[in-house]
């Protein structure tokens, strides 16, 4: 009896394996959304799977399989943050897989297993002194006043 119960538990845990995902917004590192999603077709790219996840959860977004423009209206048309002397920051949604940012668009990335972790982060790129100095740095480190209340 114990042996068959153990085997059933192992079989259920393997069949329930799914990628984990989270969406981290503008103001702090706590996820706005998180969960898991079983990938049954590994020929679908990560962009297609992102769209499926967002639609399944009813997450309001604008975008397509190669980019996400807005999640819950952020950044909307407020993606440009001017600074002194012509410097500026641009806000946008960036993705990570297993803690690293792949060097290509999301529609060119394919998950390899249901052990992967997908993370969407509202990030920024910084144009400073005539060159790009940062890319996809989490915006919660800035806490943009357009989206975040002061602490």
What do these predicted ranges mean?
Residues 16-151:
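Ubiquitin-like/PB1-type beta-grasp interaction modules and other compact soluble beta-rich domains
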């Amino acid at each position: 009896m114990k042996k068959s119960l153990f085997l059933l538990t192992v079989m259920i845990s393997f069949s329930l394996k799914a990628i984990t995902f989270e969406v981290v917004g503008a103001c702090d590192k706590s996820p706005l959304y998180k969960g898991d999603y079983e990938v049954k077709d590994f020929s679908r790219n990560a962009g297609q799977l992102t769209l499926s996840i967002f639609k399944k959860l009813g997450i309001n977004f604008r975008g397509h399989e190669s980019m996400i423009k807005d999640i819950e209206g952020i950044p909307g048309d407020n993606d440009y943050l001017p600074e002194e002397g012509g410097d500026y920051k641009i806000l946008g949604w960036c993705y990570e897989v297993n803690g690293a940012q792949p060097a290509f668009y999301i529609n060119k990335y394919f998950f390899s297993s249901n052990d992967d972790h997908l993370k969407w982060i509202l990030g920024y790129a910084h144009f400073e002194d005539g060159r790009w100095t940062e890319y996809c740095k989490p915006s919660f480190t800035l806490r943009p006043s357009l989206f975040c209340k002061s602490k």
